[in-house]
């Protein structure tokens, strides 16, 4: 009889994924539990922290989100940044340049009023001339109206993720990289731990924050998630501080399906495209750096399709060459909402995924909300709109689901 191998490790709570969401959950758990010998927290990832989707994020911290729950999660991230700066004694480089939401048509003005109407933060309404004074790269003639939210900004996503990591470590959280998680082990309807390429780790609670790999990992426990990996992409112009000053606000331009922000004297801009590229989560490689996302569906095709309207709104783009193209995978859901909280099918399994291109912005709120759910406490944000099972039983690998998730990205109008 072959003896069962002994577990290689154990923890009270295991977080799978050392991207910004996993680190934010670990940070929040660590600060509630403390380092005084209470419940232990272990973060596991095959990659070094923050080297996958987090490292490629545009990291717009826009507060106008279209629904109160998501907006509350973003507000909590601003609070988290302040808390981290105080704890670590350093400036995390939050650029509070504000966000300018631009409407190029009367119909879009109505939609914009709805979007920012629920915001609890100040909003300044501007005409085309006012918008162009604030953002000189905009064409006043092309702007019908614009809403400026002066307290918004953007941040270096890796720097913020590393702050969560360091703060979590100070609170006693352990982080183990170089371990490939193969499955969540379930016994009699509840989590028993995780199987890795090096052996079994005992844990009665697992938080799935595995990003693009989260659907496959959840399926190993018999849970279907309503999400798919979808390509996100942006471009960076050559440095032209004469055209794109460093204090330029974040620009959200839904008529062009575009956003932009300053990047060291250049302009970083993204286009959502009429048809986003979604991938089969069952066929992902272990490292997204190995994916050919540049040409699979043509980053150039998306650029050409959206260029005319974007250049009409932002004519200086015609004078600036493009220096860089960046693509990576976000996880989008069919209804454009995060996947957060307990999985109803398996006791002890929680989700922190489905970032929908807003994972950096909502990271602090997600960390605190998921930590509260794990610990059975009342959080400040109701996670019901983000419940993993909200769309019913589904096949996470179906082409129809992938198409719906891709459409959710293409139709996105917030930051």
Segments from the language model and where they lie:
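Beta1/beta-strand and adjacent pyrophosphate-binding region of the FAD-binding site
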Residues: 5-21, 42
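Conserved Rossmann-like nucleotide-cofactor binding loop
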Residues: 21, 49, 213
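Active-site substrate-recognition segment that forms the wall
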Residues: 27-31, 59-61, 90-95, 190, ...
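Glycine-rich FAD pyrophosphate-binding loop
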Residues: 30-54
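Dinucleotide-binding Rossmann-like beta1-alpha1 core, especially the glycine-rich loop
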Residues: 58-134, 257-260
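Short beta-strand to alpha-helix junction loop
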Residues: 72-75, 101-111, 147-166, 295-304, ...
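Helical element adjacent to the flavin cofactor pocket in flavoenzyme catalytic cores
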Residues: 147-204
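C-terminal catalytic lobe of FAD-dependent flavoproteins
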Residues: 157, 304-404, 415
């Amino acid at each position: 009889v072959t003896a069962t191998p002994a577990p290689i490790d154990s923890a009270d709570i295991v977080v799978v994924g050392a991207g910004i969401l996993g680190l934010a959950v670990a940070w929040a758990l660590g600060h509630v539990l403390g380092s005084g010998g209470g419940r232990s927290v272990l973060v596991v990832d095959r990659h070094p922290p923050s080297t996958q989707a987090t490292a490629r994020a545009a990291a717009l911290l826009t507060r106008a989100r279209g629904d109160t729950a998501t907006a509350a999660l973003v507000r909590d991230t601003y609070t988290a940044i302040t808390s981290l700066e105080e704890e670590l004694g350093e400036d995390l480089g939050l650029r509070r340049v504000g966000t300018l939401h631009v409407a190029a048509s009367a119909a879009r003005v109505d939609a914009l009023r709805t979007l920012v109407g629920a915001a609890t933060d100040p909003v300044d309404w501007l005409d085309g001339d006012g918008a162009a004074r604030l953002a000189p790269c905009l064409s006043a003639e092309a702007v019908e109206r614009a809403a400026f939210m002066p307290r918004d900004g953007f941040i270096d996503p890796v720097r913020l993720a590393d702050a969560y990591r360091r703060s979590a470590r100070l609170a006693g959280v352990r982080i183990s990289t170089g371990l490939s998680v193969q499955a969540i082990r379930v016994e009699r309807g509840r989590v028993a731990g995780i199987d890795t390429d090096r052996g079994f780790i005992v844990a009665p609670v697992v938080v799935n924050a595995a990003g693009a790999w989260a659907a496959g990992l959840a399926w190993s426990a018999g849970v279907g998630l309503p999400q798919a990996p979808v390509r996100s992409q942006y471009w960076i112009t050559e440095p032209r501080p004469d055209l794109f000053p460093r204090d330029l606000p974040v620009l959200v331009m839904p008529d062009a399906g575009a956003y932009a922000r300053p990047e060291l004297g250049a302009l970083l801009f993204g286009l959502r495209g009429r048809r986003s590229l979604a991938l089969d989560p069952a066929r992902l490689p272990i490292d997204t750096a190995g994916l050919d996302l540049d040409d699979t569906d043509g980053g150039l095709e998306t650029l050409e399709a959206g260029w005319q309207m974007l250049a009409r709104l932002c004519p200086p783009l015609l004078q600036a060459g493009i220096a860089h193209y960046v693509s990576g995978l976000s996880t989008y859901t069919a209804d454009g909402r995060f996947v957060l909280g307990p999985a109803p099918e398996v006791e002890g399994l929680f989700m922190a995924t489905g970032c929908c291109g807003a994972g950096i912005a909502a990271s602090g709120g997600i960390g605190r909300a998921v930590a509260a759910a794990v610990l059975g406490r009342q959080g400040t944000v109701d996670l019901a709109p983000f419940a993993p099972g909200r769309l019913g039983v589904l096949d996470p690998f179906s082409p129809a689901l992938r198409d719906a998730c891709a459409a959710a990205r293409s139709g996105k109008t917030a930051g």
